[in-house]
Amino acid sequence: MASGDLYEVERIVDKRKNKKGKWEYLIRWKGYGSTEDTWEPEHHLLHCEEFIDEFNGLHMSKDKRIKSGKQSSTSKLLRDSRGPSVEKLSHRPSDPGKSKGTSHKRKRINPPLAKPKKGYSGKPSSGGDRATKTVSYRTTPSGLQIMPLKKSQNGMENGDAGSEKDERHFGNGSHQPGLDLNDHVGEQDMGECDVNHATLAENGLGSALTNGGLNLHSPVKRKLEAEKDYVFDKRLRYSVRQNESNCRFRDIVVRKEEGFTHILLSSQTSDNNALTPEIMKEVRRALCNAATDDSKLLLLSAVGSVFCSGLDYSYLIGRLSSDRRKESTRIAEAIRDFVKAFIQFKKPIVVAINGPALGLGASILPLCDIVWASEKAWFQTPYATIRLTPAGCSSYTFPQILGVALANEMLFCGRKLTAQEACSRGLVSQVFWPTTFSQEVMLRVKEMASCSAVVLEESKCLVRSFLKSVLEDVNEKECLMLKQLWSSSKGLDSLFSYLQDKIYEV
């Protein structure tokens, strides 16, 4: 049985911008040292906004302290250089007591040097920012100084255990027996020194990471409460990075739920969940693990607004340009093994299509057993348009399901099908409204998971057994044709010219 450990985020160590100008954060995983830190793109931290806000807030506070310190030093030097002239300007007697009072009065009218109260009460002001953190103050000869955040006994900053609140974010299949996730999470106690929070980001079907709470009066908090069940991955308050057979997946997320395995396409190395041989290998490995564990079925979905954009064209150009014969064989075999894994998987496969599915991402859908789609989803297989032959057994399954006329229009002309059209033609089982899509899917998946594993597996065998050998033969022929196409200079030049034109258009 494959293990299903969840890796919890301890804190954010650093951030940077990648080559595309997007933010990446250096994550410290709880229970791991600094050598295990990994850079994660911002779209993988969909529900870890409070970690991001805390990190950004501390940096903003640090910058403010530096600026305040510089201004304090400058103002002090100016006062020292003026000397008695300060007292003369005040038009007050020059006795020591009055002089001291005058100095403090000038200090109050200087905005950067607002006088703090000793023993600050910690209550937020009525006109302050809505989300705040606990910070202590003291007055030093050089001016205002901010004391470090207090550490609680569990090592977290102002940490309070928020088990009741966290439990609301778990689905029924998320809390495994013997695995108390709440032992590793602490709610942040927000609310004394005003520190602005950055706007929280939202991104389709994705993984959920967070550790902390927001002020109840914050509009961000109200938005999270309203949308906490909108997306599969916004139910958990943890990282969904999972250990399967002692290895971590880089471009997919695998979550072991109660009665089923959930695989999410979440590519770090390609845009719009495009497929490369490495990503397809990870999916195959996850399918192999799910086939041998106690899961009754498999749920396949994706992170982001696009389900899958098919093969990664930029990857094809780079690899086929370097070594045409070797790479054409390797990529064609990767596609063959990827499709074969779906054909041979014995348990029911449920697919949740949250957005566009193109090319190979749409071709594999007939190999799955149930396809549920959002109203926003659409389907396209423009193989002839991009100078490729069909893949994913679509040359056989599409005419069988859609009819020869519509299948030819999709494969030869790249016709786009809406979710409703795909449902009426039999490619999609059912279409749901986007705002309730995740709830509808999870409800039905959990109902299926309550059935007998033997009944589900044997039922699929009865439906699919006579097609298995046919699909395997079709898969072999399609991949052989792709290999021949990529190996020939004519076919490769045609592909390059089209893909380069598309890249230049972007």
UniProtKB/Swiss-Prot annotation:
UniProt feature, compositional bias: Polar residues: 133-143
Residues passing through the membrane, by range: none
UniProt biased composition (Basic residues): 101-120
Tissues/organs with expression: Ubiquitously expressed.
Subcellular location: Nucleus
Nucleus in keyword set: yes
Highest taxon of source: Eukaryota
Signal peptide: none
UniProt keyword annotations, A-Z: Nucleus
S-S bonds: none
Renumbered residue ranges of the record's region Disordered: 64-177
Assembly information from the UniProt record: Interacts (via chromo domain) with histone H3K9me3.
Name the record gives this protein: Chromodomain Y-like protein 2
Gene: CDYL2
